[in-house]
């Protein structure tokens, strides 16, 4: 039965005209041959991993540890690392990563999801709906 469930994305991909299909260690990767209206954006479809669901544990220790982990912010590179290719000036010097406490606090909240009823979330939903409608129209 798991094999049949894992083939469902492939059958949907065939009906949508997917040009490339590949599977990497239980991950199904589908790439569309169609481009969006913008030349800078190319649509890719990546399905979630095909694996059995793990049982969830409802313990106070786990939830408090997750809250602490969510509040602690760490950068992805070590301090002092030269960030190659991030220089925005021609002939300039590549920036160097700093300690986490040297960055402004608002930087760590840039990638957080907006509140469901906020103006930002509604704007994002509206733009996503427009992009989806434009993608489905014939060109």
Curated annotation (Swiss-Prot):
Keyword Mitochondrion: yes
Presequence extent in this chain: 1-50
Region annotated Disordered, chain positions: 35-74
One biological process term in Gene Ontology: mitochondrial translation
GO CC annotations, alphabetized: mitochondrial large ribosomal subunit; mitochondrion
Subunit field text: Component of the mitochondrial large ribosomal subunit (mt-LSU). Mature yeast 74S mitochondrial ribosomes consist of a small (37S) and a large (54S) subunit. The 37S small subunit contains a 15S ribosomal RNA (15S mt-rRNA) and at least 32 different proteins. The 54S large subunit contains a 21S rRNA (21S mt-rRNA) and at least 45 different proteins.
Family designation: Belongs to the mitochondrion-specific ribosomal protein mL54 family.
Official protein name in the record: Large ribosomal subunit protein mL54
